[in-house]
Amino acid sequence: MMFINLLLRLMCVFLIGADGQMVQMESSKAGFVGSQVELPCQFVNSNPPVKISQVTWQKLVNGTKQNVAIANPALGVSVLNPFRERVRFKNPAVRQRTPSLEDTTIVFNRLKLTDESTYICEYTTFPAGNRENMVNLTVFARPMIQMSLSTPSIVAGSKDLKMTVATCVSANGKPASVITWETDLDGESNTQEISNPDGTVTVRSDYFVVPSREIHQQLLTCISTYNEEQYTDSVTLNIQYEPEVIIEGFDGNWYLNRENVQLTCLADANPTISLYQWRYLNGTLPSSAELRDDVLIFKGPVTYDIAGTYVCDATNSIGSGSASVEVIVTEFPSYPHEVFQDQQQAGVVIGGAVVCGTVLLAAVTLLVVFLYRRRCMFKGDYSTKKQILGNGYSKAGNVPSHPSLPHSLTFSDDSDEEKKLELYRGSSILGGSVQEFHTCHDSRIKAYRTGLIEEHERCAFNEQTYIYEYGSEVEVSVDMIPQMDGSVISKEEWYV
């Protein structure tokens, strides 16, 4: 059949008559089952024109021609069985009383797999004779993708025995599909193809893995690739397994008189647990123990009576699982190392905050005291200098009639005022009387308004200011410090 098709194609792809007539067609067409497809056919009638007597569409079946549709100018249009309900001429002019047969394209509706074949469009002309061409129609079938678990529930078994957990089927596809698996499971697949009588192919792929609790609820995806199109379907594995049990609640710090302690039985199982049972290996359960399914509650304060080993048994339809815990009761609570570290860190933080607050308070206090003393001790112009007995000049800038002091008059803070006064009295240079300020009413005495005397009296420091008469008025305070150049400045200026 392939040889005949090839021969016909070589002869008829562009069959040109002696006068230039030919039939134009596409070499191949394709469609999916249930869809619609057009098979074009056009007649090129060159000069001189010829008369078209009839157009016949034929299906080539096993080397023989089977009529599909006929268009005759005199007899009209006819579509034969089994194509009558699904095949028609596309151009309405073909069906007119005076038809135009240059374009006799036919349309297939509800395409079937059996429609796949080679179709011939044949023109009968006068006087040129017959002209024809052919087209190959291919029909595709999209597969039905179905994925399922091997059984609704899979029971976990031996760790070395793999079993089929899921099956993916791409049924009745044309051409055949390619099946792959997408999953995190450590399994393998087995794929086989089955050819069907209608020319389609069914592909089946089974996935094998060792069923266990670890793969429960894992996703398994089947990917079917067909004609560069991908179809996916997924299932979630349902693995049944016996309970795996642990007991929580004992923290290693159950001490006498502790309140609200309990043990909880936690079980990982599929299906769920149907029965919980508690056992006390040291005898019967203590009187303070109360059973509430998976929880064992101890009422009242902790006593030595509840010490011992407790066992929880959990059961489901697949099997049973157990776990135990040994409860130890101590006289005093024990604090974990982590708690001690947290407390120590908290103490460091609190101590640091206290120290910082204390330092800040002390600094503020010192600052306030310093400012207050400074205000009490000196209120004047720091740039003021008092001449005293020895720089060779009077306050007005005149040369004094007496020689300058041979040395500076300097006193320490703790010098006795009587000694200071005696020293001044014994000096021949002074040559005058010394009087206390508060008893002196001489109008010739001029006190520089530094504010020292008044402020000292107001602050009650009991300090005395002495006035020395030597050509010009001079005042000296015990808080004033004589300098080498004969001037005297306050202690604050001296420190600066």
Curated annotation (Swiss-Prot):
Q: Where is the signal peptide?
A: 1-20
Primary localization? membrane
List the glycosylation sites: N62, N136, N282
Q: Which domain of life is it from?
A: Eukaryota
Effect of disrupting the coding gene: Fishes lacking both nectin1a and nectin1b leads to defects in cell adhesion upon serum depletion. The absence of nectin1a and nectin1b also promotes melanoma spreading in melanoma models.
Q: What family does the database annotate?
A: Belongs to the nectin family.
Q: What does this protein do?
A: Cell adhesion molecule that promotes cell-cell contacts and plays important roles in the development of the nervous system. Acts by forming homophilic or heterophilic trans-dimers.
Q: What is this protein called?
A: Nectin 1a
Q: Which organism is it from?
A: Danio rerio
